[in-house]
C-alpha cells in the first residue's frame, strides 16, 4: 500500500519541515485544519462547485488523432488542462487553497510565481473569494512575463518584484516565506507546486489529483482499460503529481516525468533536478536540487519560465527512488519542436512547459507501438509564450 507522506511529513527519506520555529505553529495549524476540511463533505461540495462552474472541470480527455497518425505508434490522448479558466492546471490548486484560507478565517494570501501562471491563478481565486493578495516575483521573470504582471494587477493583486539573488523563482519563494513568518496570523501562503515544507506537497498534490481521477474515469470509458504510459512535464511537479498520483497503485501504467533539459544536461544549463541534481535541503524540504559541492543552489536555465525551478517536489524524489516513475529530459530545442508539432497536427498551441511532455510522448508512443495508449498531461496553453517563442522560431509561409 502506498501511504505517503508519513505522520512526520516525509515521503520516504524526502520532504519534512525544515523551517524556523516561528513557522512550525503555522504549518501544524494548516495541517490540522486541512485534515479536518478534507473529510468535510461541505468543503468538498463547495470545492467541486467552483472547479466545475468557475474553472471548467471536468476537462476533456481528447484523442489526438492527427498526432497519433503522424507518430505512427500508440494512440495519444491529451488531458486538456489548457482549457481551464486562466489557461493552466494551476487554478485547481489556488481555488482549493483560497477556500482553505477562508475556512481558516484569514483575509490575506501571498504567493510566489515564476512564469506568472500561479500568480495569475492565485490573484484570480483571491478576486473570486474577496481575499487580499500579494504575489512575489523575481525581477528577471517579471521582465520575461510582463503581460502576466499586468494581469495580476488587473485582478487586484499587489506584485512585489524581487531584486535579490538570481531574481527568479527561488528568490521569490524566499521572500514569500519571509512575509509569511512576519504575518502568519493573518496570512496564508499559497504555494504553487508540490514543494516546500509539509503539509504543502500533500495539499497541492491532493488538490491537483482531480486531474488523474478524471483521466482514469475517462480513459476507462473510452478504451475500457488504463493507459500504458502517462507523460507530464516536471518543474516543481504539481501537474505531473496531479495526474500520476491516482495511478500510483496501477503498476501497469508507466509514469514518465519530463524535466527541462535546457541546452543539454552536459552543459550544466538546464533545470533537471532529478536527472542532473543531487539530494539537499531548500525551501523547507529535503529533495533533489541543482547545487554545487557546497550545497549552493546553481542557476537554472529553461526556455520555459515555469520549469525554471532548481528543485523538485519530495514525492517525485520518492517516485524516482522507488522507481515508480521514470524521469527524463527534453531540451529547449525539443520543446520548441513539440510546440510546433502540436500546433500543426492538432491546432492546439501548448504551453512551452507542456511541449516538453509532448515531444517525449512522441518517443514513448513510437516505442509502445500500435497497440499502446499514451496520455499526455497538457498542463497549459501557449498564449503566454508567444512573444518568447517568436524570438526562437522563424516560420515560413
From Swiss-Prot:
Cofactor annotation: pyridoxal 5'-phosphate
Documented EC number(s): 4.2.1.20
Protein name: Tryptophan synthase beta chain 1
Native source organism of the sequence: Aquifex aeolicus (strain VF5)
Pathways involved: Amino-acid biosynthesis; L-tryptophan biosynthesis; L-tryptophan from chorismate: step 5/5
GO cellular component: cytoplasm
Entries under CDD domains matching the protein: Trp-synth_B
Name of one Pfam family that matches: PALP
Biological process terms in GO annotation: L-tryptophan biosynthetic process
PANTHER family attached to this UniProt entry: TRYPTOPHAN SYNTHASE (PTHR48077:SF3), TRYPTOPHAN SYNTHASE-RELATED (PTHR48077)
N6-(pyridoxal phosphate)lysine modified-residue sites: 90
GO molecular function, one term: tryptophan synthase activity
Family from the record: Belongs to the TrpB family.
Quaternary structure annotation from Swiss-Prot or TrEMBL: Tetramer of two alpha and two beta chains.
Catalyzed reactions: (1S,2R)-1-C-(indol-3-yl)glycerol 3-phosphate + L-serine = D-glyceraldehyde 3-phosphate + L-tryptophan + H2O
